[in-house]
């Protein structure tokens, strides 16, 4: 694949959230979300003939038809194989995707973890009958029945791809090889003006994760379930960091340019960004998953509860998670494929090693994006802070 598409400011806008959730955890060691039952929506019991059309909402790069690069096309082969004409609406943020799904005009969506539970509890998506998606059987087990894609053991989608928000640094400037997020929080003054961070309220979770591991007295159990006291501590840490941040980034090209120009030397990143910088060969960078773990994303293909073309949507979910196509998508987009067999199909033989695609131990250290709720998503009570509060705090942090 010639160039990656990556999400840009996927969570940078405020989310209008009014969902009552039961207990759940963002840790990959928890099996599914348990608690308040979502609205009853019937799942498809058996596949029928394709309806001839498919309307989906997707991140840029998830449904390529050759228009961006004529060699990158899995939409047309799908149409030829199934007879389902694909119409794609590009979603720019999770918030936008949620609103589009609520119109009932689409058959499915590639939802990130900060959107999935909202869609489930609003009754906008249907449970998925995984028996009707043959390729589901070889999806990485650590992505199945997770808090962001299932409720009480029932899958609400098919895992597509995932990635971590890792630490990147310039080894010729940064002294030693950092192993902790402390390098950009408590130790950031050493690189004053050259520290960078993700520009979104959800970045508060990164600070919360660091405090969860280093300040046990705060009793943080989940970086997305913060009481007022815990949120205050995370905000204080980020205000301290802000004094040393040269610039925040949401567009990946901005971070590439910052590292290549030398205006940034350390900060949070995506692996694909490090790969782009490495390919440009203007400056050397290294990445590490710090000892505290990291935040990250896991995307899921979900079926609308109002789908007019459910059979075509099921055909799409099976095709997009086939070994060949999932490999194509992963390399083009810049993320780990969900399909275990995809690793034998990548054009870059080292791709899955670079993205830790089959490394369950690595994946277990990722706390995937989840929208903060007043009712704590870790099941600890109803005294947590909602995302709207995070938005306000983020504005204060940046001044």
Predicted regions and their residues:
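Extracytoplasmic ligand-binding site segments that recognize negatively charged/polar headgroups
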Residues: 55-70, 105, 110-260
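A bilobed periplasmic-binding-protein/Venus flytrap-type ligand-binding module shared by bacterial periplasmic
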Residues: 168-173, 209-211, 297-309, 328-332
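Mature extracytoplasmic/periplasmic domains
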Residues: 303-368
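Bacterial lipoprotein signal-peptidase II cleavage site
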Residues: 24-34
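Early extracytoplasmic/lumenal segment of secretory-pathway proteins
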Residues: 36-119
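Periplasmic-binding protein-like
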Residues: 137, 235-241, 271, 281-302
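Conserved C-terminal helix/tail region of periplasmic/extracytoplasmic solute-binding proteins
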Residues: 364-399
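C-terminal motif of bacterial Sec signal peptides marking the signal peptidase cleavage site
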Residues: 19-23
